[in-house]
Amino acid sequence: VDLDLAFGRGENSELLARVIREVPVRVELSGGITSRSAIEAGLAMGPERVNIATQALDDIDAVCEAIDAFGERVAVCLDVRGDQLAARGGRGEGGNVWEALRVLNEAGVARLIVTDVTRDGQMNGSNRDLLARVADRTPACIIASGGVNSLADIEALRALGIEGAIVGKALY
């Protein structure tokens, strides 16, 4: 995640491109990716996938065009607070998550990264209710984020059919 780009404090593309080239694992690129040119620049670095920021959903038609153009090479981040999108690193307000999800489904989104921003970094467990509701409303693969805190939490997510989980603070 390029947090500098996500928060408008610069970017780290050269460093990220080097990391992607040199590490022997599959890498996803996230953080401040809100335009087609940013998607193309990100994909040119060689990651497996580029994750489109929630903020990009302000222009959901452009996101749908990116889904059509890049398919499985892009995922869409849904940063959520209640039933609302929480763009700009969870600081801003967006539209209704369920309406956005409906439009993304129609566009054929392959993968979603769903983050409950109220749990992000709190290590109090993932919001399995939210994730189950999203899973019930989309055929897309789902990556859970926000509050994931234990192997038991990950196992519970797996039982919901969630494809993967982002574990951050709990690793420390």
Regions found by a protein language model. Give the residues of each.
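Charged helix-capping and loop-helix junction motifs
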Residues: 10-17, 60, 90-99, 124-133
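Catalytic cores of alpha/beta
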Residues: 14-16, 22-50, 62, 129-165
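Residue-level marker of alpha-helix boundaries and capping positions
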Residues: 7, 29-30, 53, 91, ...
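Glycine-rich, proline-tolerant flexible connector loops at the mouths of alpha/beta enzymes
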Residues: 1-14, 54, 113-124
